[in-house]
């Protein structure tokens, strides 16, 4: 099991008239990407602001490698805020150089690192361009470059792809996964289902200041909600009634019914059970003309836990 590097222990945070976090407890493991998934105001940004020392908890403890957060070396953490924070009157290279010098990175190493980061973020041709001339997507990529120029072991990203077009989002995702390849630990906040699903080793679903569930995306989709939907069409529709009766023995079956001469099954972890379903149908002498499956999604999980959809 990976080493725990950050522990949020029974954290509460209150503002006048609002309880932003309500007894939140989770651990961040070395080398993982964790997503905090929830709506605006759910408590995601409050959580990471406390992790990096920008806010103090009302109660509870935050530990880094088992020690109080006051022992945290600021060079070990990189923060990419939701708002773009760049010097518009400087070039891309100059922005990164200024930040690098603040972290006392040696001049030769800093220049090499800047060029590598710009290449990774597809910004090499913008090296000598003023920030003010960049598109919104390019500024977002520069924002994360500024947060990682000092090679931090922990990278904190607050809604990193907010408002990005699909191409810029993919470039940013590739860079986030590159941070994991380097052995860095990443925690990000998001309200985008596909972002949490694609990037995260684990997802924490937060709503109204409470941690509702924390697990891998795969496990969350396997165990929460009504499950996957399997649609079976038999060669002979007259077999449907008998096959439905037999399929009721399948484990974790939440529903089964006939619709438009097709058999519809709703069950958890259907992909794993698909061979058993096919074998059972064929063992009864029936033939499958067509089969399709719609897998449970993180959106389904979120709706099941909160009772509403998450905005996209």
Residue ranges and their predicted role:
Residues 97, 101, 108-126:
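Conserved ABC ATPase "signature" region
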Residues 52:
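Helix-to-loop junction immediately C-terminal to a conserved catalytic motif
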Residues 130-134:
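Conserved ABC ATPase signature
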Residues 60-73:
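Conserved ABC transporter NBD signature motif
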Residues 174-268:
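ABC transporter nucleotide-binding domain
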Residues 155-158:
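Catalytic Walker B motif of ABC-type/P-loop ATPase nucleotide-binding domains
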């Amino acid at each position: 099991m990976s080493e725990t590097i950050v522990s949020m222990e029974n954290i509460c945070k209150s503002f006048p008239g609002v309880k932003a976090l309500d007894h939140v407890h989770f651990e961040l493991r070395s080398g993982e990407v964790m997503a905090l998934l929830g709506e605006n105001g759910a408590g995601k940004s409050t959580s990471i602001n406390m992790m990096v020392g920008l806010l103090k908890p009302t109660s509870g403890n935050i530990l880094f490698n088992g020690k109080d957060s006051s022992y945290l070396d600021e060079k070990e953490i990189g923060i990419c805020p939701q708002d773009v924070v760049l010097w518009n009157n400087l070039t891309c290279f100059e922005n990164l150089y200024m930040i690098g010098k603040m972290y006392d990175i040696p001049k030769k190493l800093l220049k090499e690192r800047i060029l590598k980061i710009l290449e990774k973020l597809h910004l090499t041709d913008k090296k000598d361009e003023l920030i003010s001339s960049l598109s919104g997507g390019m500024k977002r990529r520069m924002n994360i470059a500024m947060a990682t120029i000092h090679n931090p072991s922990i990278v904190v990203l607050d809604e990193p792809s907010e408002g990005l077009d699909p191409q810029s989002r993919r470039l940013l995702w590739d860079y986030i996964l590159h941070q994991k390849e380097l052995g860095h630990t990443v925690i990000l906040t998001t309200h985008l289902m596909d972002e949490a699903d694609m990037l995260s080793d684990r997802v924490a679903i937060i709503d109204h200041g409470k941690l509702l569930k924390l697990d891998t995306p795969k496990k969350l989709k396997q165990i929460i909600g009504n499950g996957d939907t399997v649609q079976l069409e038999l060669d002979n529709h007259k077999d449907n009634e008998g096959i439905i009766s037999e399929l009721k023995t399948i484990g974790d079956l939440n529903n089964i019914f006939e619709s438009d001469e097709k058999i519809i099954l709703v069950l958890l972890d259907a992909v794993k059970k698909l061979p058993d379903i096919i074998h059972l149908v064929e063992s009864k002498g029936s033939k499958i003309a067509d089969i399709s499956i719609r897998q449970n999604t993180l959106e389904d999980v979120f709706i099941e836990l909160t009772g509403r959809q998450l905005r996209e």
